[in-house]
From Swiss-Prot:
Cofactor(s) this protein requires: Ca(2+)
Binding-site list for Ca(2+) 1: R22, D23, D74, D76, D82
Family statement drawn from the similarity comment of this UniProt entry: Belongs to the plant CAR protein family.
Disruption phenotype: Reduced sensitivity to abscisic acid (ABA) in single and doule mutant lot1 car9. When associated with disruption in CAR1, CAR4 and CAR5 genes, altered sensitivity to ABA during seedling establishment and root growth regulation.
Annotated protein name in UniProt: Protein C2-DOMAIN ABA-RELATED 9
PANTHER family tied to this protein: PROTEIN C2-DOMAIN ABA-RELATED 4, PROTEIN C2-DOMAIN ABA-RELATED 9
Gene for this chain: CAR9
Domain of life of the native organism: Eukaryota
UniProt: Ca(2+) 2 binding residues: D23, D28, D74, K75, D76
Species for this entry: Arabidopsis thaliana
Induction info: Induced by abscisic acid (ABA).
GO molecular function: GTPase activator activity; metal ion binding; phospholipid binding
Record localization: Cell membrane; Nucleus
């Protein structure tokens, strides 16, 4: 029997910024996002180191501790595709924002709920804001690619409690379905 997912994470892959050159003067980039046994990819944008994908990839989240990996590749016709860098998407702060005891409906549109600064434990290129926008919690982020000389990818995250999903619960409850608690008393 397969466990129900906690929910659905939509990853809107917006664009690449100053991606590495892997062909003679440019690259043909695409993005691959992996989570556990799920692997999704964008279309290839030919001859462009600043591609605009504007694509939405949807992941089913069963365990919030599974890392989400983003890898950019250069499509090659006659040889293997070249890696153009990678990053890990830390979406735990985003999920924690969903747990906050706030009446989100009373917040003004575009209100920042939480800010995450770049640091050694994340791949953020700049501060990222989790906002209440159009009745949803969203997080815009720019990830700095690792293992490459240059390049960033702009994303937006959006959580959905899909049909048949467990959901995230609320911080005030005794136990949330996504983060087990253990009392020591």
């Amino acid at each position: 029997m397969e466990d129900k997912p906690l929910g659905i994470l939509r990853v809107h892959v917006k664009r690449g910024i100053n991606l590495a050159i892997r062909d003679a003067t440019t690259s043909d980039p695409y993005v691959v996002i992996t989570l556990a046994n799920q692997k999704l990819k964008t279309r290839v944008i030919n001859n462009n180191c600043n591609p605009v994908w504007n694509e939405q990839l949807t992941l089913s989240i069963k365990d919030v501790n599974d890392p989400i990996r983003l890898t950019v590749f250069d499509k090659d016709r006659f040889s293997g595709d070249d890696k153009m860098g990678d990053a890990e998407i830390d979406f735990r702060p985003f999920l924690e924002a969903h747990q906050m005891e706030l009446d989100f409906q009373k917040l003004p549109n575009g209100c920042a709920i939480k800010r995450i600064r770049p640091g050694r434990t994340n791949c953020l290129a700049e501060e990222s804001s989790i906002t209440w926008s159009n009745g949803k919690i969203m997080q815009e982020m720019i990830l700095r690619l690792k293992n490459v000389e240059c390049g960033e990818v702009e994303l937006m995250l959006e959580w959905t409690d899909g049909p048949g999903c467990k959901g995230l619960g609320r911080e005030g409850s005794k136990k949330t379905p996504w983060m087990p608690t253990k009392r020591l008393d």
